From Swiss-Prot:
GO CC annotation terms, alphabetical: caveola; cytoplasm; cytosol; nuclear membrane; nucleoplasm; nucleus; plasma membrane
UniProt protein name: Alpha-1A adrenergic receptor
Gene3D superfamilies attached to this UniProt entry: Rhodopsin 7-helix transmembrane proteins (1.20.1070.10)
High-level lineage: Eukaryota, Metazoa, Chordata, Craniata, Vertebrata
Lipidation positions, renumbered (S-palmitoyl cysteine): 345
Native source species: Oryctolagus cuniculus (Rabbit)
Short sequence motif named Nuclear localization signal, residue ranges: 334-349
Function (record text): This alpha-adrenergic receptor mediates its action by association with G proteins that activate a phosphatidylinositol-calcium second messenger system. Its effect is mediated by G(q) and G(11) proteins. Nuclear ADRA1A-ADRA1B heterooligomers regulate phenylephrine (PE)-stimulated ERK signaling in cardiac myocytes.
Length: 466
């Protein structure tokens, strides 16, 4: 993916002295391209550190994002500096051998970045279509295998020219040109862009269809599970159920639906974020992969060198803007970025995986009216957590201290309005753990664990109902 320098296409077998460098142009290009490279390097390092330093981001999906950032980091740190020097000087100053190696690394990193987006799109399709089965389908071992396949496939695409699959090299070593051998151009364009693009678009079209269908069900206030014929309302009602098997089965079904609802909402938000990444990828790389085959197969229609340079650097730009997309479209990454940069927010830091609010109806008031005396537990920074365990349709809320020395129980006032904090510690389809406690908990006290019968739960994420 290296463009021609000067009039190399017309005199590739002749050696010319390098043209004098325009100082003002060199300074301007140096500032612009140097700033772009520095931004790309620091941004991708920030993405990697954000995932590495936050345990709640240690998931297979985020490992795929880290792999994308690694490919972009390698491109911006090892390829783009030489591309910038090439552009500023107007000729290649590093010899023929390094030109070939540099071009191969360029193709390797660009292909790995694109294939990583392809893997991410497949991951999002599985996450949105099968939110409860996702942890068993996408395991860490399978994720690692996928990452190895990404780099193996990228290596296969990139090493062809090193073994002679290219047009004859010019005698002038100040010329480092793109490999225009038609067979390799077709092979690399299909493998590096068009096949991954087809998969990406197919996956996101499917994600859009599934998300639209699920969202339509949520907006109507009803949710039907594929494995059951009964419809369950969005707001899950829990009442004292008989000890018989039917009551237990009903409670299990409702718990299943509520967790599925929550997981689907989170997967849909992740798909939106990565959908923006894919959209920017298409806008950045499509012009290059249109221009390159045209110039190779139809030399008479080869675009001017200036046009080729623009679309070439537009493709490079994609590796620099991904770190902007994450914090702008994902609150999760925004908070992680802020923590890494040690930016003090107006709100207290939350170590939760995802903020979750609960609206509760106390048993004594639930029958008097749906909204009367409804207790809202907003998101906060309490230092206690509860685990929800269910027996016969009744949820037990057990309050513990999360102090380092152990888990001491604390007092929860009978007046539930005094409870002012709630946040999620961890979530899986087996349990939900949250931070809940009074405004000024006293971890030193040890009292009987209270049990609260929940008649209605309304789940919300970041202030939005799910």
């Amino acid at each position: 993916m290296v463009f021609l320098s000067g009039n190399a296409s017309d005199s590739s077998n002749c050696t010319h002295p390098p043209a004098p460098v325009n100082i003002s142009k060199a300074i301007l290009l140096g500032v612009i391209l140097g700033g772009l490279i520095l931004f790309g390097v620091l941004g991708n390092i920030l993405v990697i550190l954000s995932v590495a330093c936050h345990r709640h981001l240690h998931s297979v999906t985020h490992y795929y994002i880290v792999n994308l950032a690694v490919a972009d980091l390698l491109l911006t740190s090892t390829v783009l500096p030489f591309s910038a020097i090439f552009e500023i000087l107007g000729y290649w100053a590093f010899g023929r051998v390094f030109c070939n190696i540099w071009a191969a690394v360029d193709v390797l990193c660009c292909t790995a970045s694109i294939i990583s987006l392809c893997v991410i799109s497949i991951d999002r399709y599985i996450g949105v279509s099968y939110p409860l089965r996702y942890p068993t389908i996408v395991t860490q071992r399978r994720g690692l295998r996928a990452l190895l396949c990404v780099w193996a496939f990228s290596l296969v695409i990139s090493v062809g020219p090193l073994f002679g699959w290219r047009q004859p090299a010019p005698d002038d070593e100040t010329i480092c040109q793109i490999n225009e051998e038609p067979g390799y151009v077709l092979f690399s364009a299909l493998g590096s862009f068009y096949v991954p693009l087809t998969i990406i678009l197919a996956m996101y079209c499917r994600v859009y269809v599934v998300a639209k269908r699920e969202s339509r069900g949520l907006k109507s206030g009803l949710k039907t599970d594929k494995s059951d014929s009964e419809q369950v309302t969005l707001r899950i009602h829990r009442k004292n159920a008989p000890a018989g098997g039917s009551g237990v089965a009903s409670a299990k079904n409702k718990t299943h639906f509520s967790v599925r609802l929550l997981k689907f909402s989170r997967e849909k938000k992740a798909a939106k974020t990565l959908g923006i990444v894919v959209g920017c990828f298409v806008l950045c790389w499509l012009p290059f992969f249109l221009v390159m085959p045209i110039g190779s197969f139809f030399p008479d229609f080869k675009p001017p060198e200036t046009v080729f340079k623009i679309v070439f650097w537009l493709g490079y730009l994609n590796s620099c803007i991904n770190p902007i997309i994450y914090p702008c479209s994902s609150q999760e990454f925004k908070k992680a970025f802020q923590n890494v940069l040690k930016i003090q927010c107006l709100r207290r830091k939350q170590s939760s995986k995802h903020a979750l609010g609960y609206t509760l109806h106390a048993p004594s008031q639930a029958l008097e009216g749906q909204h009367k005396d409804m207790v809202r537990i907003p998101v906060g920074s309490g230092e206690t957590f509860y685990k929800i365990s269910k027996t016969d349709g009744v949820c037990e809320w057990k309050f513990f201290s999360s102090m380092p020395r152990g888990s001491a129980r604390i007092t929860v006032p009978k007046d539930q309005s005094a409870c002012t904090t709630a946040r999620v510690r961890s979530k899986s389809f087996l349990q939900v753990c949250c931070c809940v406690g009074p405004s000024t908990p006293n971890p030193g006290e040890n009292h009987q664990v209270p049990t609260i019968k929940i008649h209605t739960i309304s789940l919300s994420e970041n202030g939005e109902e799910v």
